[in-house]
Swiss-Prot record:
<feature type="coiled-coil region">
    <location>
        <begin position="29"/>
        <end position="58"/>
    </location>
</feature>
<keyword id="KW-0472">Membrane</keyword>
<dbReference type="InterPro" id="IPR042125">
    <property type="entry name" value="SMIM11"/>
</dbReference>
<keyword id="KW-0812">Transmembrane</keyword>
<keyword id="KW-0175">Coiled coil</keyword>
<keyword id="KW-1133">Transmembrane helix</keyword>
<dbReference type="Pfam" id="PF14981">
    <property type="entry name" value="FAM165"/>
</dbReference>
<dbReference type="GO" id="GO:0016020">
    <property type="term" value="C:membrane"/>
</dbReference>
<feature type="transmembrane region" description="Helical">
    <location>
        <begin position="10"/>
        <end position="32"/>
    </location>
</feature>
<protein>
    <recommendedName>
        <fullName>Small integral membrane protein 11</fullName>
    </recommendedName>
</protein>
């Protein structure tokens, strides 16, 4: 067995952990962006419906 490789295992684990953390944070950021965009779209639709119902009442 190559013992030189085993010396680098902690470094490789730190790199793997960092990559995983970056991917998780990126995924969470994308989900937050999508949710905010969807909420803005829903608010816009509600405002349009409110305007249309006010027009019908008048």
């Amino acid at each position: 067995m190559n013992w030189k490789v085993l010396e680098h295992v902690p470094l490789l684990l730190y790199i793997l952990a960092a990559k995983t953390l970056i991917l998780c944070l990126t995924f969470a950021g994308v989900k937050m962006y999508q949710r905010k965009r969807l909420e803005a779209k829903q608010q816009k639709l509600e405002a349009e419906r409110k305007k249309q119902s006010e027009k019908k009442d008048n």
